[in-house]
């Protein structure tokens, strides 16, 4: 089987990636070939020592998203130091041509691969000519005069601008985790919350604050509930230095302990702040709930 393929980390599988992948899909259909997105189980940046890189997707989410945009095959390579030491030509010969059967390679407008990432598009075209691989340059996806990139989206999330991040992603940014035991302070105030444990370092957390969210129970459940979520240190109830994620689901009753939840971020309502009393906190939560109920996007 021969393929039209592209390669990259595809962190986020955002609108920029989607433009590139649509080019791959269209070209594959024109040539009567299969479409392939080649990616990595672990980010090359993490393997090469950039431990501060926190990703937008888990590997499982990335695989699902790549298939949803029309890829027939999504090989997840194990990126190693040995692979990092391969020249671009050797990688094209040994991995793309011989291992994966790539006939046409679509290169992202700013993507580089191979030892030291020193080669560029013209080099890939030359190697491809020698190896029998057609090399095509992908088009950039620009939003408000700036290319859509994973770095740009991470900045939005780090600053709490989740609606902008979701626009650039083309879908709502989400976190999934298991409901664990909490302090039950919210329940006493009439706002029972589910405390969500997210695997540390697996995905980027938005800035501390209160957010309007959609909630799926059992992670892959079909129905979505409206909720409001707090990320932070709960200063009013003295949670100390521990950062927590807790969500209140509107108009829902039931025991969620031990269940898997996925929350989709819609809009940031406000920053987390300290209140003088629990009564003041309760009044603010009522105001937050009313605002969430009025949001047209929910």
Over which residues does each language-model region extend?
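Phosphate/ribose-recognition catalytic cores of enzymes acting on nucleotide-derived substrates
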Residues: 182-298
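N-terminal Rossmann-like or analogous alpha/beta NTP/dinucleotide-binding catalytic cores
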Residues: 46-131
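Glycine-rich, Lys/Arg-enriched anion-binding loops that position phosphate/diphosphate groups
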Residues: 128-230
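N-terminal catalytic cores of NTP/NDP-binding nucleotidyl/phosphoryl-transfer enzymes
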Residues: 1-59
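A non-catalytic, amphipathic alpha-helix used as a structural packing/dimerization or gating element
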Residues: 19, 23, 61, 164-171, ...
